[in-house]
Amino acid sequence: MQCPSCQNTDSRVLESRSADAGKCVRRRRECLNCDFRFTTYERVETIPVTVIKRSNAKEIFCRSKLLNGLTRACEKTSINNQKIEAIVDEIETHLQQSNLKEISSVDLGEMILLHLKSVNEVAYIRFASVYRQFNGIEDFIDTLESFKPSNKFAAIS
């Protein structure tokens, strides 16, 4: 590992520990040339997942883009940043564990909606309105109907 101070490649590891819930290793190092101490993180290299957009354009999955979209949908709700990060982590983990090389933006959006539906209805509606490109009040009403409990005896007087 190259020293950030003198660029020497000889260093020794002073301490190693698991970090980021076991997803990486944090190492404290010391340069053998200048005694500068620095921290490195070792992570498993993952194969990037390509998102196929509605226009058939392709782009690499971007965690920050997903995080920003969820944060906007969850503004002024009871969902805190830790929960948003946890949702993004779950989706990212699912993508890596499924060994998908590509995923459609439609499938990705449905995964997000599935998480939001069980967490917060307002965030779900906000995200769905953008993701599903609502054109009017009917789209909102149809989506809101999915939250009503299906009770076949409710209509009987």
From Swiss-Prot:
Zinc finger feature spans (unnamed): 3-34
Molecular-function GO term, any one: zinc ion binding
Cofactor note: Binds 1 zinc ion.
Residues covered by the ATP-cone domain: 49-139
Keyword Repressor in record: yes
Domain of life: Bacteria
Cofactor: Zn(2+)
Pfam families, per the entry: ATP-cone, Zn_ribbon_NrdR
UniProt xrefs under InterPro entries: ATP-cone_dom (IPR005144), NrdR-like_N (IPR055173), RNR_NrdR-like (IPR003796)
PROSITE patterns: ATP_CONE (PS51161)
Keywords tagged on the record: ATP-binding, DNA-binding, Metal-binding, Nucleotide-binding, Repressor, Transcription, Transcription regulation, Zinc, Zinc-finger
Residues making up the signal peptide according to the UniProt record: none
Family: Belongs to the NrdR family.
Task performed by this protein: Negatively regulates transcription of bacterial ribonucleotide reductase nrd genes and operons by binding to NrdR-boxes.
Protein name per the record: Transcriptional repressor NrdR
Organism the protein comes from: Prochlorococcus marinus (strain SARG / CCMP1375 / SS120)
Taxonomic placement: Bacteria, Bacillati, Cyanobacteriota, Cyanophyceae, Synechococcales
